[in-house]
Amino acid sequence: MIIVLMGVSGNGKSTVGRLLAERLDWQFLDADDFHLPQNIAKMASGTPLNDDDRRPWLDQLAETLQQYSKQRKSVVLACSALKQKYRQRLAPDPANVHFVHLQGSYELILSRLEQRTGHFMPAELLRSQFTDLEPCPDALIVNINQTPAAMVEQIVARLGLNTVLHSTTLADGLMFPEAPRWHDGELWFTDQHARQVMRMHRDGTLSKVIDTPDLPGGLGWLPDGTALVVMMTGRRVCRINEGQLEDYADLSGLASFHCNDMLVDRHGRAWVGNFGYDLHAGAVVKPAEIILIPPGGSPRVVARNVIFPNGMAITADGNTLIVAETFAARITAFDICADGQLVHRRIWADLKGAYPDGLSLAADGTLWVATPNINQVLHLREGGEILGRIFTRGTPYACTPGQPDETQLYITSAETDDPDEARSLKSGRIEITGIR
């Protein structure tokens, strides 16, 4: 995760940045340390920098941030980043880069600059910086008319960094574990690219439940305890009966592309999402459907125009279905009608570039959401407030609280979701962290 403290010279970026990095135990970088000697001399002479002057400076900063990102290291950068094109250069993929604008009036900042000594930036250049400064629509705005310590605490709270956890590996050597579910005190999951349904026993050992002829997707159980599993490319759902797979529902005439995750409620109703398009071939994103399989009835579409419907959960009262729209970077809620139809669609949380995958509802109504493109599991309240972040060892794709007391979170992760790479690397893990 990268935090960029931005704004004009003299707004306290370096001071707040150092304190913030110390508070989070992250690395701190000051963009002033990356300026070329000729740029420092130019500013010291009272001449503002232009775009050409700043280009190599921004290139070096962007390369440095990219290296931190590749190594999954978190960093705080103090950088003016005055123009939108500068910010785009620093963060071509903004999902894991958070801009924080330390904002104050010209008069307040000028008074501070006039008292500053030992810096190459003269106070008379402040007006040119305000002239160059362009709004950053996605930035967190923090008013500088408060102490640096207060600003740090505001940033930490607003970015959901008051609670930061790190996971450890419980099991590894898997290909692509997905869809973790608890059943009879054991953790079941699919190892998708190994084409297996697996379970983890109470002692932490793994065993195979069944091999599948297709990529297995979501899991669930009917009220009588019969396990259901999605066959992704065949677009069907099978039941597991005495170690054999039996057809349960054919969705091939309804699903736009490969089926994916599935949610089965206590009444035996199953909702199934699908890709909508050929993800791994690089096709253009297209909307998909959510399909309902009612007990003893024919499958039917109950929601359309959903962007890559993925992980799902149902609220404790059974009245609301929550679904991750992965490549829309949002979580959506529907009311559930008596017949299973989904109505009154609304945004539960806008994740602002983070892609939600598997998710799980906590007992208090908050959500744990795996977001693979930022390598974090987010703890969310409805409306999008981030209550906490889990930094995982691998790329997280799904998660579920431990049973029965929800004191731990189990996370399925891998280094890649590409089928060939997943089979070769066997980087899949079950990770775990305490959440209480």
Q: Positions of the model-derived regions?
A:
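Small-molecule kinase domains that catalyze NTP-dependent phosphoryl transfer to phosphate-bearing small molecules
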Residues: 115-154
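Conserved substrate/cofactor phosphate-moiety recognition/catalytic segment
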Residues: 18-61
